[in-house]
Swiss-Prot record:
GO CC field: cytosol
The protein's name: Thioredoxin domain-containing protein 17
Keywords: Cytoplasm, Disulfide bond, Redox-active center
Family the UniProt entry places it in: Belongs to the thioredoxin family.
Organism of provenance: Epinephelus coioides
Residues annotated as the enzyme's active site: 43, 46
């Protein structure tokens, strides 16, 4: 059994609900472009980053939560007024962040296994 909880959500409302149901826990969130029926995201950087991020998940802190969030279709994501950009201040996908902290890896930073591991292991 994993030492962390993984939650898969789609869209801003589901993300907020997942966070509110886990108040007080150490939450890591990974934001990716939506996947199609074949499981491939419209975002090429997300396709590159996902196996790297998943490869470091064994380093997640005991009892933490990993939320995998699909941000929506490309047209929704590109709209500068979408809730992810307005409220969470996301600037690109993929983004990996430690919720409630300034710690954030954006786009190509998510390709670097050492940076991902540091985020999962540093307080």
């Amino acid at each position: 059994m994993a030492h962390y909880e993984e939650v898969n959500v789609r869209g801003y409302d589901e993300f907020c609900q997942a966070v509110s149901e886990r108040k007080g826990k150490d939450i890591f969130a990974y934001f990716s472009g939506d996947k199609d029926a074949s499981g491939k995201s419209w975002c090429p950087d997300c396709v590159t980053a996902e196996p790297i991020v998943r490869g470091q998940m064994s380093h997640l802190p005991e009892g933490s939560v990993f939320i995998y969030c699909q941000v929506g279709e490309r047209a929704y994501w590109k709209d500068s007024t979408n809730a992810f950009k307005k409220t969470l201040k996301l600037s690109g996908v993929p983004t990996l962040l430690r919720y409630g902290t300034p710690q954030k890896l954006v786009e190509e930073e998510c390709f670097k296994a050492d940076l991902v591991r540091m985020m999962f292991t540093e307080d």
